[in-house]
A protein has these predicted regions:
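Short beta-strand elements that form the blades of beta-propeller/WD-repeat-like
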Residues: 1-7, 12-14, 35-49
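Structured surface patches comprising rigid loops and adjacent beta-strands/short helices at the edges
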Residues: 27-32, 36
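Surface-exposed loop/turn elements that mediate protein-protein interactions on large endomembrane-trafficking
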Residues: 11-27, 49-61
Length: 62
């Protein structure tokens, strides 16, 4: 489960309840939503939802 998401100018960092961290390049994206299981970013008019290990779950027009 996701504990929190932090970000800097280049990366999103997903920290789990077990203390594990996964990272993903921002590449002009912004964080729009997160909960304990998934997180969603918006980039160039599309939304991308990922799990705690930064695996893509779904994408759609935003």
């Amino acid at each position: 489960m996701i504990r929190y998401i932090k970000e800097d100018s280049q990366y999103f960092y997903v920290v789990t309840e077990r203390g594990q961290t996964s990272s993903m390049s921002k590449n002009h994206a912004r964080l729009v939503n997160s909960n304990s299981r998934t997180w969603t970013i918006e980039r160039w008019g599309y939304a991308y939802t990922y799990d705690e290990k930064c695996n893509l779950i779904e994408s759609h027009k935003y």
